[in-house]
Regions:
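A short beta-strand-loop-beta hairpin characteristic of the jelly-roll/cupin
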Residues: 1-17, 27
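Amphipathic, charged-and-aliphatic alpha-helical interface segments
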Residues: 86-98, 225-240
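Winged helix-turn-helix DNA-binding recognition segment
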Residues: 10, 19, 116-120
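Strongly charged, low-complexity linkers/loops
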Residues: 223, 240-244, 248-249
């Protein structure tokens, strides 16, 4: 689960699965679950015969609320460089990429509250399958179905929204996808093909025809929103920094600023932990140095 650790007089630290907290002797502290999560941990004590925990006063509701709120609102101001809708896209995309359905569920409700329609949110979840696979995309959609059903049962309005517009371009899907990729990346269509495209031409055709034509041409999301979603999904998947380099470069080419990408990573850090955000901060730093 997700929890908090706080030493007396210090800010609360948000902790995630896999985190290790080392506590020196005689440090007054508390730890426990985040407001929206369960939390379990293993404690390893050195010198157990002489080293014992001393239980002090309980943490009051006011102390707990103040500590967790300060941590959760750490990036609230800086993240305003992204619109509420964009912040919602980042949250649901990163949770989907990781496969964290427990926290995806409230994030989906927040996306509806941010003004997104059912069809627009579905589009983010559909887009996700190209980067994290059908299983996580479909499980995210099933989770969204639960959210919509529960809101309906509580009398809450869920606007469905419009459908994607029909494609009127008469060019082949490959040509359309090729042109979309050139537009969003700034790489000319006659540039030398990447090594993978030469080695496995079929995947290059699928990328052009399906990803950049069938998906990117659907106008329920802008190119900008799709790339914010893509980077967020890749952050949730983890370990795919070479892919993130390409898509973060596309973000910058589309006019998304380094500050806005940093805000995206702030959201990933708060929701998933630094294990997921820090590798991409390194990518962003390298890209901005090269500009």
């Amino acid at each position: 689960g997700i929890g908090y650790y706080q030493e007396k007089g210090q800010p609360a630290r948000r902790v995630y699965p896999g985190d290790i907290v080392e506590i020196a002797p005689d440090i007054v502290h508390w730890h426990g679950a985040a407001p929206d999560s369960w939390f379990a941990h293993i404690a390893i004590t050195t010198n157990p015969k002489t080293n014992a925990a001393v239980w002090l006063d309980p943490v009051s509701d006011e102390q707990y609320s103040k500590a967790t709120s300060a941590s959760e609102n750490r990036y609230a101001e800086t993240n305003k460089v992204l619109a509420d809708r964009e912040q919602a896209i980042v949250a649901i995309a990163s949770y989907t990429g990781k496969g964290d359905l427990e926290h995806l569920k409230p994030a989906l409700a927040e996306a509806l509250e941010a003004g997104m329609t059912i069809n627009e949110i579905n589009e983010v979840l559909i887009h996700a399958y190209a980067y994290c696979g059908f299983p996580r995309s479909l499980r995210a959609i099933q989770t969204f179905m639960q959210v919509v059903d529960e809101r309906k049962a509580n009398g809450m309005n869920n606007p469905v929204g419009r459908k994607a517009s029909a494609i009127k371009d008469s060019n082949s899907r490959y040509e359309r996808g090729r042109d979309v990729l050139a537009e969003i990346s700034g790489v000319p269509i006659d540039a030398p093909k990447a090594g993978y495209a030469v080695f496995a031409p079929t995947i290059e055709r699928f990328l052009k025809e399906h990803l950049f034509a069938d998906l990117f041409e659907r106008d329920l999301l802008t190119y900008r929103e799709r790339e914010l979603a893509t980077v967020s999904i890749l952050a949730g998947v983890g370990g795919v920094e070479p892919m993130a380099v390409g898509h973060m470069s596309i973000c910058l080419h589309l006019g998304i600023t380094a500050e806005q990408i940093s805000a995206l990573l702030n959201i990933v850090e708060m929701n998933l932990g630094k294990t997921y955000s820090e590798p991409l901060r390194g990518v962003l730093n390298q890209l901005t140095k090269e500009q």
